[in-house]
Amino acid sequence: MFIFIFLSLWTLLVMGREEGGVGSEEGVGKQCHPSLPPRCPSRSPSDQPWTHPDQSQLFADLSREELTAVMSFLTQKLGPDLVDAAQARPSDNCIFSVELQLPPKAAALAHLDRRSPPPAREALAIVFFGGQPQPNVTELVVGPLPQPSYMRDVTVERHGGPLPYYRHTVLLREYLDIDQMIFNRELPQAAGVLHHCCSYKQGGGNLVTMTTAPPGLQSGDRATWFGLYYNISKAGYYLHPVGLELLVDHKALDPAQWTIQKVFFQGRYYESLVQLEEQFEAGRVNVVVIPNNGTGGSWSLKSQVPPGPTPPLQFHPQGTRFSVQGSRVTSSLWTFSFGLGAFSGPRIFDIRFQGERLAYEISLQEAVAIYGGNTPAAMLTRYMDACFGMGKFATPLTRGVDCPYLATYVDWHFLLESQAPKTLHDAFCVFEQNKGLPLRRHHSDFISQYFGGVVETVLVFRSVSTLLNYDYVWDMVFHPNGAIEVKFHVTGYISSAFFFGTAQKYGNQVRENTLGTVHTHSAHYKVDLDVGGLENWVWAEDMAFVPTTVPWSPEHQIQRLQVIRKQLETEEQAAFPLGGGSPRYLYLASKQSNKWGHPRGYRIQTVSFAGRPLPQNSSTERAISWGRYQLAVTQRKETEPSSSSVFNQNDPWTPTVDFADFINNETIAGKDLVAWVTAGFLHIPHAEDIPNTVTVGNGVGFFLRPYNFFDQEPSMDSADSIYFREGQDAGSCEINPLACLPQAATCAPDLPVFSHGGYPEY
């Protein structure tokens, strides 16, 4: 019997110091001492290496060796005109990204279930051809790995035609060239007003830019508003707008031809920085002086109080109850494979409970933040984070903060905007967690006396993405009753704007001259459930009060509660608009029945406060048309792998993927189905968001819960459950496993040295 124990780590550290200190060279490796308890059985995260993906790991992200092989092959095939994406200008040809090309589902299942040969392992490369007569974006499938011999252009096949070049993602070099243009060429033209308001000195480095998106107002545009902020060292500059925003047209392939189209300064618009400076010199600009307070103040994340007693620690008295081998997680109840899409973020595959597959894929697709405000940058912004890359901007997980100290940490290899692969250390964590809550329990002292229950212990898979100012904590949680919980929390810095005029219509003032801008957060998920097989049906259930004559007293009438059931036949019937009505029970069911004659099913239960979607008459709405629906169920198709695209951000007016096209009223009866789930919330920033937004109350998601899938509650077979009745000695190990705690937990956790994955270079 495994038991989680809460201990004060402080005690362990004091004990460890007597023997060289916990995590010190002397302390590590000592197994026993007359004055110390023995070390608990454990496995260091270093014992969980990222192995080379073999044929059994169909969904494992590409290894460093595979990434290198693909890059070498493409470099050879595409010729000498390729430029390192890290240095590429818009007029260059470069390989933007290489990642795993997911295998077709039919081929994957044939291998997993029927031992057919595994499908070819392939990579997907995105190439920017800025140096061709007709600049374009091309998608290439490369295989087979690990020794590629072919590449296949799939751009037309997937997108119906070539991808216009203006849809390509803004490379880091492009941002650097924009900064060089702004700081070296443009700002000196308004040196007087900027020195007066913002302590500006040419080359002084006290200002930084922050991008917005989308870049313009119609297809073909590539004109982006950039806000300027104080460069606050070792703290979030996002809270320090100076009131200057610049509209940069960077569509030309030659950076020398880029221009400033419009200037916004502290509530007024100007044609150029020259005009702003002229009006300032003429005394026609009312300048608000923005103090530069350096690193001090409430916006720093460095605590102003000394450390206190160490928080509680969860550890494993009898060793971990799960294993991570390559990309596969295995516990006594659950197995699944995990990965990280470079743009779409965390994803899991082949999810099984007690050996039976429940879902083929559960994956994040897109995350969107829509802002409002009375400055141009604030009012225009609709961030579509798949464009920036929710895998690309995954961050190292900090031991003991992002995940429990003793979690298992796994690295991720990627090739993005570079000629060589890189490694993000501690990109994922997997851990088992005592929720401090009974999964089920009952105490009876009526008629008979007994107690039975089981603690809620969950298995968690986690990653974190930091997109500019915001940090997204992505969780997939596996419960012992067969339920899966998918959720995300938001933390980090809010985005802010210069406070003027009617600013309070768009948020709250959070510091002097600073508006915390109102915005929404939404995420979209793909849920490919296979409930008892590939053929599934969609059922909706709710309740109604029905007037009923009382059988034994016909002169009286009551309102009787009853269940209303309906099988949904088409995709239109199973698409539920955000903000509209929806059945409180919606589940996918098999043609199989449980012991009681009900179809075995899995219910989708959303926990979301997304509110109203972007109106459909908005010019950018089609790029995020998935936001129209809180839930939609469609036929699964290989031609509809994702609800969004990395290219939607830079051309939302003619989106590369329009999710609404997936819903075309096809039958969903007895088909392989995918549920698409939206979760989100409204955020009106307030004083308590300074310096950081907290995760409390800022988490949403959904549950996948068994609904007549089993014959009874599956945790009845849990080895963690306890039961004792009147007359039994509840303090006996033979009766109650928890009574064995003093013996089972007489060990000290073998704590690894604190580590942090560093600060990746993008």
From Swiss-Prot:
Question: GO cellular component terms?
Answer: early endosome; endoplasmic reticulum; extracellular region; Golgi apparatus; plasma membrane
| Location of region: Disordered | 23-54
Sites binding Cu cation sit at: H519, H521, H683
User: How is its cofactor bound, per UniProt?
Assistant: Binds 1 copper ion per subunit.
Q: What molecular functions are annotated in GO for this chain?
A: copper ion binding; primary methylamine oxidase activity; quinone binding
Q: Provide the residue positions that the database annotates as binding substrate.
A: 383-393, 467-472
- Catalytic-site annotation from UniProt: D385, Y470
Which residues are listed for heparin binding in this entry? Answer: P577, L578, G579, G580, G581, S582, P583, R584
EC number(s) for this protein?
1.4.3.21
Q: Which cofactor does it need?
A: Cu cation; Ca(2+); L-topaquinone
Which Pfam families does UniProt cross-reference here? Cu_amine_oxid, Cu_amine_oxidN2, Cu_amine_oxidN3
Task: Describe the processing and modification events after translation.
Answer: Topaquinone (TPQ) is generated by copper-dependent autoxidation of a specific tyrosyl residue.
Record note on quaternary structure? Homodimer; disulfide-linked.
Q: What is this protein called?
A: Primary amine oxidase, lung isozyme
Organism in which the protein naturally occurs: Bos taurus (Bovine)
Q: Name the lineage.
A: Eukaryota, Metazoa, Chordata, Craniata, Vertebrata
